[in-house]
């Protein structure tokens, strides 16, 4: 599939998505959202892909946020030049149909797709990550950053509010106090603060960033069953919002029952007893166990 705003490469079991609008500091557009969603669909459908890395083109920016080329109309649907291409959520009386896809936040549509990905996702932040450039990172499993990276949840400085479901993700990653500080002030801060506050896992020299991300991807997946990884990703992320450990017990019980009868479980035990590498054959593309139907997203509206 040909893309206009991103580059997609598959090598050594890793699908790498590179945000590719270097002349605009990889600024985010509705087309980029759709193309990134399609790339994650590709990753989930390809059993040769064991992990996903997301990075940016050039040395200046990972993603400088939403493309503000529309000026003051950037976040005002009724004044946008592309509103007819998107389909109109405006009713004849001028009110907004909030159930219409055109009324949804594009950043949230992307982060929810990343949240539902069946492969580990690693962010390799090579430069400025501001606005949606910062919030799209939050549902990724690991974030590695260049020492020159900068971050900013700048929404209050633009007269808007945090988007991309970041009000759910960010406090869970860094705590409510840090999340409020960053979002109230809208300040842009450096890689050292991001690392200190646990937004990023590690800092690397720019030339070492992608090699480190690839090494981590291989470490995470080399000896693990793909279906087990897919299920584990959903279990751990979704239980962040559980009201009681009984919810985890329910899903654990369903998944152990389903996976215990799978060929991968027999192979995992046999390989351990025989002291040899495991050869797992169950595939993510063939579908997850019926018990995974427990993972049902709420309706948008």
Give residue ranges: language-model regions:
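C-terminal long alpha-helix characteristic of the crotonase
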Residues: 22, 144-149, 200-250, 258, ...
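Glycine- (often His-adjacent) and acidic-residue-rich active-site loop
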Residues: 56-113, 129, 159, 243
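Acidic-histidine catalytic/liganding microenvironments
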Residues: 3, 46, 117-118, 262, ...
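Structural motif
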Residues: 28, 101, 124-125
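Crotonase-fold acyl-CoA enzyme core
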Residues: 112-227, 262, 266
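Conserved CoA-thioester-binding segment of acyl-CoA-metabolizing enzymes
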Residues: 1-55, 59, 72-76, 292-301
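Short alpha-helical scaffolding segments that buttress acidic/His motifs in well-ordered protein cores
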Residues: 182-186, 232-235, 256, 272
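Terminal peptide-recognition signature
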Residues: 17, 21, 35-36, 54, ...
